[in-house]
């Protein structure tokens, strides 16, 4: 399952684009910190499409606190210098404004105007005065409801599904298989 849930603030105003086919796109960066280490902030690039992008472009601004529900994707493009650039970003499936740094009137305006048509879960699409921990609890309960009805596959079916995935580990064939995470040390301070 590919699912991402992040609570954080917009690091900049949304960047609006329209594709050659006339589809609206919004790009934002979410700044979030760990509960245990408030001194370290992480920035997550995010993209939204169509009605979700229209909502973001119309109502959200730098500094607004939001809860994002989405999925992680990897894409590539060729830079102006001719180099292939690989990007990992979050595709926003739904977004819920939690508070605005700009004004209190923005919240009531968001409530009235945002009615998503392309999101699967409207629970995260409307304004709320929830705290971050309440938003996370709400997400976890909705996530548990969704996954409890999910059909679990057998181990053989799972092997079949991931047989072409070079990153999938199959510990049944090699019980001593170990994945080294030493490369993560270069990102630590």
Swiss-Prot record:
Q: Which domain of life is it from?
A: Bacteria
- Residues of the region (Disordered) are 100-126, 143-176
A Pfam match is SSB
User: Quaternary state and partners of this protein?
Assistant: Homotetramer.
Q: What is this protein called?
A: Single-stranded DNA-binding protein
Q: For bias kind Basic and acidic residues, which ranges apply?
A: 155-166
Q: Report biased composition (Polar residues) as residue ranges.
A: 143-154
Which residue ranges does the record assign to the SSB domain? 1-99
On whether DNA-binding is a keyword of this UniProt record, the answer is: yes
User: In the UniProt record, which is one GO cellular component term?
Assistant: nucleoid
Q: Where is the composition biased (Low complexity)?
A: 100-124
- Specify the species: Malacoplasma penetrans (strain HF-2) (Mycoplasma penetrans)
Q: What is the lineage of its organism?
A: Bacteria, Bacillati, Mycoplasmatota, Mycoplasmoidales, Mycoplasmoidaceae
């Amino acid at each position: 399952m590919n699912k991402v849930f992040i609570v954080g603030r917009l690091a900049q105003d949304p960047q609006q684009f329209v594709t050659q086919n006339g589809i609206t796109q919004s790009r934002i960066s979410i700044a979030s910190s760990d509960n245990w280490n408030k001194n370290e902030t992480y920035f997550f690039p995010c993209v939204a499409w169509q009605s979700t992008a229209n909502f973001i472009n119309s109502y959200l601004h730098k500094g607004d606190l939001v809860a994002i529900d989405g999925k992680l994707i990897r894409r590539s493009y060729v830079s102006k210098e001719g180099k292939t650039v690989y990007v990992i970003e979050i595709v926003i499936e739904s977004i819920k404004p939690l508070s605005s740094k700009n004004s209190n009137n923005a919240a009531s305006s968001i409530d009235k105007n945002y009615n998503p048509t392309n999101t699967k879960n409207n629970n995260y699409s409307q304004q709320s005065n929830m705290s971050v921990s309440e938003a996370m609890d709400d997400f976890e309960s909705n996530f548990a409801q969704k996954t409890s009805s999910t059909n679990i596959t057998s181990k053989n079916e799972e092997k079949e599904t991931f047989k072409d995935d070079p990153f999938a580990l199959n510990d049944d064939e090699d019980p001593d298989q170990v994945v080294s995470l030493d490369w993560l040390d270069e990102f630590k301070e």
